[in-house]
Amino acid sequence: MEKGQMLYEGKAKKVYTTDQEGIYWVEYKDDATAFNGEKKGTIGDKGIVNNRLSALLFEVLEKTGIPTHFIELLNDREMLVRKLEMIPLEVVVRNIAAGSLAKRLGVAEGLKLSRPVVELYYKDDALGDPFVNESHSLAMGWAEERDLKEIQELGLKINGELQKILDQAGIILVDFKLEFGKAEGKVYLGDEISPDTCRFWDKETQEKLDKDRFRRDLGKVEEAYAEVYRRVKEVLKD
C-alpha cells in the first residue's frame, strides 16, 4: 500500500489518498484545539494515544457487529480506513450531565441521567457545530430518514459496548461524540474514539481523563490520555 497526496488536514488528523481505490491513510497529530479553534496547543503523544486507542476500540466494536471505517493499524500514528461519504452530523451520546448539556439545562455537572440522551449537531465550524434535531436534519437534507434512525440506534449500541469495557478499566463514560458515513449504501462509524471525542472520568475519584484537562487548564493532560490507553489496553489484552 502506497501513501499518496494529502487530501485534507483537520484539527487532529491528516488524511491521504492511497494507491488502492476506496482506502484512505490517516495520520493522527498532537495538535489540540478547544472552543471551536479559539484555544490551540499541543498534547505530547496525543496522536499516538488516539490512533492506538481508536484502533483497539474499533476492533472490539466490529466484533459486536458494528461496522466501522477501520481497516488496519500501520504504526503509532497512522491507520488505514475505508473511504466514506460523511453524514454532516455529530451524534453525541450522554450518560451524565456535563459540558454544554449541564449549562443548557442549568443542572449540576455530574448529574447521572436516568437514561442515555442522544443529541445531533450539524458539523459546521463556522457556525460552531449548532445543536439540531431530526426535523432540521431531514428538512435540510443532511441525512435520509432511515440513516438518521440508524446512526442514533448505533450511537446507543456503541454506548453500551464502550461502557462494558470502560467500567472494567475503572472509567466512567460521561459522554462522547460520533461521526458516521456511508460506503456503497451502508452506514459505517468513522472518525475516532479517544479522549479528544469522549469525556472520561475516573470511577473512584471522578478525575477528568480527557480533553477537558486541556480546555480548563487542569494540567497533566498527557498523563491522562496515556492512562486511558493503558487501562483500556490492559482490559482488552486477552
From Swiss-Prot:
InterPro entries xrefs: SAICAR_synt/ADE2_N, SAICAR_synt_PurC, SAICAR_synth, SAICAR_synthetase, SAICAR_synthetase_CS
Pfam families in UniProt: SAICAR_synt (PF01259)
Catalytic function, reaction form: 5-amino-1-(5-phospho-D-ribosyl)imidazole-4-carboxylate + L-aspartate + ATP = (2S)-2-[5-amino-1-(5-phospho-beta-D-ribosyl)imidazole-4-carboxamido]succinate + ADP + phosphate + 2 H(+)
Protein EC: 6.3.2.6
Associated pathway: Purine metabolism; IMP biosynthesis via de novo pathway; 5-amino-1-(5-phospho-D-ribosyl)imidazole-4-carboxamide from 5-amino-1-(5-phospho-D-ribosyl)imidazole-4-carboxylate: step 1/2
Gene3D superfamilies: ATP-grasp fold, B domain (3.30.470.20), Phosphorylase Kinase, domain 1 (3.30.200.20)
Superkingdom of the organism of origin: Bacteria
Xref: SUPFAM superfamilies: SAICAR synthase-like
Disulfide bonds: none
Enzyme's top EC category: ligase
Keyword field: ATP-binding, Ligase, Nucleotide-binding, Purine biosynthesis
Molecular function terms, GO-annotated: ATP binding; phosphoribosylaminoimidazolesuccinocarboxamide synthase activity
Single GO biological process annotation from the record: 'de novo' IMP biosynthetic process
Family statement drawn from the similarity comment of this UniProt entry: Belongs to the SAICAR synthetase family.
Protein name, UniProt field: Phosphoribosylaminoimidazole-succinocarboxamide synthase
